[in-house]
Swiss-Prot record:
SUPFAM superfamilies: EPT/RTPC-like
Name of the protein this chain belongs to: UDP-N-acetylglucosamine 1-carboxyvinyltransferase 1
Species per Swiss-Prot/TrEMBL record: Lactiplantibacillus plantarum (strain ATCC BAA-793 / NCIMB 8826 / WCFS1)
Catalysed conversion reaction: phosphoenolpyruvate + UDP-N-acetyl-alpha-D-glucosamine = UDP-N-acetyl-3-O-(1-carboxyvinyl)-alpha-D-glucosamine + phosphate
Pfam family, one: EPSP_synthase
GO MF annotation list: UDP-N-acetylglucosamine 1-carboxyvinyltransferase activity
Enzyme Commission identifier(s): 2.5.1.7
Higher taxonomy: Bacteria, Bacillati, Bacillota, Bacilli, Lactobacillales
UniProt-annotated binding residues for phosphoenolpyruvate: K22, N23
Residues bearing the modification 2-(S-cysteinyl)pyruvic acid O-phosphothioketal: C119
Listed pathway(s): Cell wall biogenesis; peptidoglycan biosynthesis
Gene3D superfamilies tied to this protein: Enolpyruvate transferase domain (3.65.10.10)
Length: 438
């Protein structure tokens, strides 16, 4: 069993490099299925388990993929005859796999995709995806754990999303690129990853306007082709390291981080007394000796991102006073708090809100990650804990962070990823930090 072991108490200093965005590259990989000619070259691709999973989905669909993990590039040839069925063994591992449905339906007129899996944080139904595809003219059936969509020719439509779902916005937008006529989507997701997908689609020959606003307009085209595209930087990874720097009273330059993409987080951190400055090379974060309490409510973009909620709770628990966090996006995203209670966190959950009483004198403990962002939050808690913290169930961490422990070690954390037998308490030796940074 692999686990991350942290010896808390070290101040983080230095520079940290941010990868391409997981939440951008996955739908862009799916969108490559729309290219009936030419090849696609993607750069700044993060080396994550979710990327390997999506690559396997595309390979099963008969695309040719070459992933250069050293240079972080992917070359894709989707011009061949494609299969229209995405099987359970791949899709069940990752929720984002459902976004292959729109591209397959648009290009082949048929898509059969297993119901998605991924992190267990709320029900996250795909009804909005199917409602939008149905509006474009697809016939939808659900059976035997699969969703099957069929359409001789998709046609443009006026679509209003009941909720600005990121996945539904992506799926419908991709399907509409090859539809006959004009599609107008209202109340859509506005995340930077939506803008990155739209930019990629336009480079492929699509006609998409309005991405990043509440209304997206897509004029259907006859065919699309491969292109070159660089994945946008990961705002959630950037935010995670910003919180880690702040909570350890550190001084860290988060390289290539885009301040515009993290405005809600930056605003709240400044409210808590954290110094956050934009520099030509990225965002610098300097943590204060005393953090002020604050209230946070997660919202769809441009509100505070739900993917930063678990990490933010660590910052709030370290604040001197009472903080409040309300989760409005997912109904079950406080599972990491039970693990933090084992580390001496004091809080009270009331419905979709949690009241946190700080400052917390975190104790090291063995804790288990329950989802991707919870895993990162537990590691950050370990950075400010007395003694040793062991974080297990790292499969979640690997879905969204590349070399997380190594990057923290280079910033000065005493942290290491180890393979130990079940039940073993790992003891750090004096050379721990040096070994971890290698």
């Amino acid at each position: 069993m692999e686990e991350i072991v942290v010896h808390g108490g070290q101040r983080l200093t230095g520079n940290v490099h941010i990868e391409g965005a997981k939440n951008a590259v996955l739908p862009i990989l799916a969108a490559s299925l729309l290219a009936s000619s030419g090849q696609t070259h993607l750069s700044n691709v993060p080396v994550l388990s979710d990327v390997f999973t999506m690559n396997n989905v595309l390979k099963f669909l008969n695309t040719k993929i070459d992933f250069d993990e050293i240079n972080k590039t992917i070359d894709i040839d989707a011009s061949r005859q494609l299969s229209s069925e995405a099987p359970f063994q791949y899709v069940s591992k990752m929720r984002a796999s459902i976004v292959v449905m729109g591209p397959l339906l648009a290009r082949l007129g048929h898509a059969k995709v297993a119901m998605p899996g991924g992190c267990a944080i709320g029900s996250r139904p795909i009804d909005l995806h199917l409602k939008g595809l149905n509006a474009l003219g697809a016939e939808i059936e659900r059976h035997d754990g699969y969703v099957e969509a069929t359409a001789n020719q998709l046609h443009g439509a006026a679509i209003y999303l009941d909720f600005p779902s990121v996945g539904a916005t992506q799926n419908i937008m991709m399907a509409a690129t090859l539809a006959d006529g004009i599609t107008t989507m209202e109340n859509v997701a506005r995340e930077p990853e939506i803008v990155d997908l739209a930019n990629y689609l336009n480079q492929m020959g699509a006609k998409v306007t309005g991405a990043g606003t509440e209304t997206i307009r897509i004029e259907g085209v006859k065919a699309m082709h491969g292109c070159d595209h660089s994945i946008v930087q990961d705002r959630i990874e950037a935010g995670t390291f910003m919180v880690a720097a702040a909570v350890t009273q550190g001084n860290v330059l988060v390289e290539d981080a885009i301040a515009e993409h993290n405005k809600p987080l930056i605003s709240k951190m400044r409210e808590m007394g954290v110094t956050v400055t934009e520099e030509p090379a990225g965002i610098r974060v300097i943590g204060p000796e005393i953090l002020k309490p604050t209230s946070v409510k997660t919202m769809p973009h441009p509100g505070f991102p739900t993917d930063m909620q678990p990490q933010m709770t660590i910052l709030q628990l370290c604040a001197q006073g009472t903080s409040l966090l309300t989760e409005t996006v997912f109904e079950n995203r406080f599972m990491h708090l039970d693990e933090l209670r084992r580390m001496n966190a004091d809080f009270k959950v009331e419905g979709r809100s949690v009241i946190m009483y700080g400052p917390t004198d975190f104790n090291g403990a063995q804790v288990t990650a329950t989802d991707l962002r919870a895993a990162a939050a537990l590691v950050i808690a370990g950075l400010v804990s007395r003694g040793y913290t062991e974080v297990t169930n790292l499969k979640y961490l690997d879905r969204g962070y590349f070399n997380f422990h190594g990057k923290l070690a280079k910033l000065g954390a005493e942290i290491k990823r180890v393979d130990v037998p079940d039940g073993t308490v790992y003891a750090l030796n004096p050379d721990f930090a040096n070994e971890a940074a290698e």
